[in-house]
Regions:
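Regulatory N- and C-terminal appendages and interdomain linkers associated
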Residues: 1-2
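C-terminal accessory/binding modules appended to enzymatic or scaffolding proteins
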Residues: 27, 34, 39, 43, ...
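Short alpha-helical basic/polar micro-motif
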Residues: 49, 61, 285, 289, ...
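Short linear, low-complexity motifs centered on an aromatic residue
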Residues: 72-88, 106-107, 205, 212-214, ...
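Glycine-rich, acidic/polar active-site loops that bind/position phosphate-bearing ligands
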Residues: 120-304, 313-319, 323-561
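Substrate-recognition/cap regions that form aromatic- and gly/pro-loop-enriched pockets
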Residues: 561-600
């Protein structure tokens, strides 16, 4: 297997575009992708025809506008390429209009009351910055989804708007440092956890089939108490699944990188390489879909529920978030972070954003499934805090106290074996209990549930940080002395938001008390978190940056509450049915058998 040749073979990527599009069309499309410029409608027919020719050469007969409604899933309607030309003949055709705009029925998707049941018209619009791909005989075209009246009905449109907001705000900051760039990219790498169970055993469990988790059961004699499953040797059946999964994902251009056993029995993880945010969101949705289908090929079922089994760890999805432009990662502190004023400014903006919007960040990852994980001694607590590590924490302290930072001498590590290499020791340890941790050149948002679409958490992060950047730029652009104003702004921000910084054990009861003393939000359940979503400052945040209107936010709040209630109701009905049809009859039969045996 030649992996470089295999990778992206089913994707209408840059290599394919360069070879199939006229030069001027290719250049125009690249400007849209690379610089965020509006698509030139005059190139639509040319791009559509090239896509169709390429897709049909891959065996595709249909195309679909692939979008992400306000569920955690994707949606698709398949239309064939055939067009009648008379004399009972057809041709294969994809027009520019069909590429750019679709018109699915919007009445049956969640709208949170923003649309009447009879109001059916909705539109899908092509996202040219995320590549199309061929899967199972269909050309998948990534799109956004809006209503006839213009409200967004999906998770991707607000994400793209938030990417625009943070791009514009960050460029203002960079310009103050003499850095000109065409575009600032937000990048993400979501670490996907999941369980694998035998298909025959799965089908015997009504609760697993209907709810994704076991509602009744006894603890296993052996769980994860021996700590021997994490990073353990892969069992042949699991290894075959992972090999098949990697190859399938690589064909779709998904940067699947790491795979390993997780802490709980039958639990595993897949981690990709970072990619541009909207592409990463699409890739993660595709990954979850492919996981389920590949598992079935191996007579297994992939469980993405956050807590499929009581008594062992549940599954999350660490969201590795960063900001970069050409040749520059804005979250790379460099060898001397204390003198890297751009990095310290970016760090201050992020800390301010997390502190100010604790409730919103908690709400954006809330779900009925995730409630079983958060604060349970296996996942981050439900209280937001930021972990910076020893070095950055000490630098922040020195800035707040107005003292010079004295860096520690670099330490080289050795395990004492002559043959082993000498290796550098990182400047900080890792804190696995932190919900929002700095890990070298990125922030790791660890509160997401495994089944969650990562669009909303990243929309919130982008928007909150963009507001901080915009506010900082307003101050610095009007400063008489830039360096003095910059130093003052960084110091004041660290001082005002230092309460959100925590490097201790997030699982401890002491942290609950300390967090309350600091005035941090403690929202233990999803319902508690959802109640904060429509706060005045949250509405102002999204509306002022053009990411979501108050109407769009209110519809989402309605959907969150409704979805939560429906999940709990389904679980309750499933429990009632299992008790009445399975458990009680089984107990009755068993007691009858015992009684008959006693008579004998």
């Amino acid at each position: 297997m030649n992996i470089p040749e295999l990778f992206g073979c089913n994707v209408f990527n840059d290599v394919v575009m360069r070879s199939t599009l006229p030069k001027d069309v290719y250049k125009s499309l690249r400007k849209t992708i690379d610089n965020g410029e509006r698509i030139d409608m005059s190139i639509a027919d040319s791009v559509a025809n090239a896509m169709k020719d390429w897709a049909t050469s891959k065996g595709a007969t249909h195309y679909t506008h692939w979008f992400q409604p306000l569920t955690n899933l994707t949606a698709e309607k398949h239309d064939s390429f055939i067009e009648p030309v008379g004399n009972d003949e057809v041709i294969m055709q994809l027009t520019g209009k069909s590429l750019i705009v679709g018109e699915p029925d919007a009445s049956s998707f969640p709208s949170g009351g923003s649309r009447e049941t009879f109001a059916a018209r909705g539109y899908t619009a092509w996202d040219p910055t995320s590549p199309a791909f061929v899967k199972e005989g269909t050309l998948y075209i990534p799109t956004i989804f809006v209503s006839y009246t213009g409200e967004t009905l999906d998770k991707k449109a607000p994400l793209l708007k938030s990417m625009t907001a943070i791009d514009r705000a960050t460029k203002r900051i960079l310009k103050l440092f003499g850095i000109e760039c065409a575009k600032v990219n937000t990048t993400v790498g979501p670490e996907q956890e999941y369980f694998l169970v035998d298909k025959k055993l799965y089908e015997q469990r009504k609760d697993l089939v209907l709810t994704g988790r076991t509602l009744f059961g006894a603890p296993s004699c052996k769980g994860q108490e021996m700590d021997d499953h994490y990073f353990g040797a892969l069992k042949p059946r699991v290894a075959d699944f992972m090999r098949d999964l990697d190859e399938t994902l690589w064909k779709y251009g998904v940067l699947s990188k790491s795979k390993h056993n997780e802490a709980a029995p039958a639990q595993h993880e897949l981690a990709p390489i970072f990619s541009t945010m909207n592409v990463a969101v699409d890739s993660n949705q595709l990954t979850m879909d492919v996981m389920k289908k590949v598992a079935l090929r191996h007579d297994m079922v992939c469980l993405l529920h956050e807590k499929p089994f009581a008594g062992v760890n549940g599954s999350g999805k660490h969201n590795n978030w960063s900001l970069s432009t050409t040749g520059l990662n804005l979250l790379d502190p460099g060898p001397h972070p204390e003198s890297n004023t751009l990095f310290m400014l970016v760090l201050a903006c992020i800390i301010k954003a997390v502190d100010k919007y604790q409730g919103l960040l908690r709400a954006c990852i809330a779900s009925a499934g995730n409630d079983h994980r958060l604060g349970g001694g296996e996942a981050p607590p439900a209280i937001l805090s930021v972990y910076l590590g020893d070095e950055l924490g000490a630098i922040v302290d020195s800035i707040v106290m107005g003292k010079d930072y004295v860096p520690k001498r670099a330490i080289k590590g050795s395990i004492g074996v002559p043959e082993s290499p000498i290796f550098p020791i990182d400047s900080t340890d890792r804190n696995r209990t932190s919900p929002f941790a700095f890990t070298g050149n990125k922030f790791e948002f660890r509160m997401l549930g495994s089944s969650q679409n990562i669009a909303l958490p990243n929309t919130v992060l982008n928007t909150a940080v963009a507001e901080s950047f915009r506010q900082f730029a307003d101050v610095l652009e009007n400063a008489k002395n830039f360096d003095t104003a910059l130093a003052k702004l960084i110091k004041e921000t660290f001082k005002n938001h230092k309460r959100i910084l925590f490097d201790g054990n997030g699982y401890s009861d002491d942290w609950q008390k300390e967090a309350a003393a600091r005035g941090l939000a403690n929202l233990p359940t999803s319902v508690d978190a959802y109640k904060t979503f429509m706060s005045e400052k949250n509405v102002e945040l999204f509306s002022s940056l053009g990411v979501m209107s108050e109407t769009e936010m209110r519809s989402r709040e309605e959907i969150y509450f409704e979805n939560y209630a429906k999940i709990i109701n389904i679980e309750a009905l499933t429990m009632i049915e299992m008790v009445s049809r399975d458990i009680v009859p089984a107990v009755s039969a068993y007691t009858r058998d015992l009684a008959d045996a006693a008579e004998i």
